[in-house]
Amino acid sequence: MISIRFQGKPFNITVIQVYAPTSNAEEAEVERLYEDLQDLLELTPQKDVLFMIGDWNAKVGSQETPGVTGKFGLGIQNKAGQRLIEFCQENALVIANTLFQQHKRRLYTWTSPDGQHEIRLITFFAAKDGEALYSQKKQDWELTVAQIMNSLLPNSDLN
């Protein structure tokens, strides 16, 4: 787990990178990860915009969880996915890459050599204070991301 904070205007951004234990890990190891992550979140200033990315070894499924996931999650929800959703609910976090449909080539970050298993990097996007940086509407979500990128990179070719 690693965290970095970018100070900027009109807001600061904290990025947290997490790699969760595999499904073979002891429950105590998984709980230790979530406890450490909770401690790190509590150290994050409330006004920061928070991006959390990582390999959670979790499938959140395609059933929408209001305020947390959209209908474009991967696979059938597993135990790790349920734990992840609970953590997000407790901390007002949104699993952003479940909110809108993506091109097939962007669904997976890893596929097993036999093609039977695929892993998707799960990303979050949320304001710690719960302000509305989240929208169920794809166009609103894209607009918010574009506004943030414009603020962060005012002199880039992206604008």
State what each model feature region is.
Residues 1-159:
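A shared catalytic/ligand-binding motif for oxyanion handling
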